[in-house]
Regions:
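Alpha-helical transmembrane segments of multi-pass membrane proteins predominantly involved
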Residues: 1-176
């Protein structure tokens, strides 16, 4: 139940943290508004083009962050007898589900600001976040559900390696 969910959460937060570190090093700031400002001047200034390794690591981690298939085994219907639905009662379970919905929107906006140049108006915000949201949806339709140990192994291998590459890429290619 919860222990497996925490293991999976930790495993996808590692590559995302590496990607964020790469972006912070690249733009020499941790301020989201300054990172967005540094990406202005055309779409070729977006992090997706200036540091594709960071975006790849973050996007692979984002697949797990959303909690959709194929990384939804913790909250999957067949996990109800041993999952959070039985470990929490009504008020705590509802808070957890509301928390997941709010964080999903916040992660979409954060991802858009860090890697896709931010948004200048509401239409651009909705269009970019919708496009980012569709990536995990399409992956969830295309791939079968992973077991927790499979997803932990996946996140700690490929996306983490790409995240480390992103930091080296920024340090030795972008900043030179």
């Amino acid at each position: 139940g919860i222990a497996r969910g925490l293991a999976q959460m930790t495993s996808y937060e590692v590559p995302f943290a590496l990607a964020v570190i790469a972006v912070v090093v690249q733009y020499d700031t941790a301020s989201i508004s300054q990172i967005v400002a540094a990406q202005q001047g055309g779409f070729m200034n977006w992090t997706v083009f200036t540091n594709p390794f960071a975006v790849a690591a973050a996007m692979l981690a984002f697949l797990g962050m959303t909690g959709y298939a194929p990384f939804d085994v913790v909250m999957a219907p067949n996990e109800i007898p041993i999952g959070p639905a039985t470990e929490f009662h009504s008020s705590y379970l509802s808070l957890m589900q509301i928390n997941r919905a709010i964080f999903a929107g916040a992660k979409l906006v954060l991802f858009m600001n860090l890697f896709f140049g931010g948004a200048g108006n509401l239409i651009e915000l909705v269009a970019k976040t919708w496009a980012i949201y569709m990536i995990p949806v399409i992956v969830g339709v295309a791939f079968p559900r992973f077991r927790v140990e499979q997803s932990v192994r996946f996140f700690l291998k490929i996306p983490t390696l790409i995240g480390v590459l992103a930091i080296f890429y920024v340090q030795y290619i972008v900043l030179k």
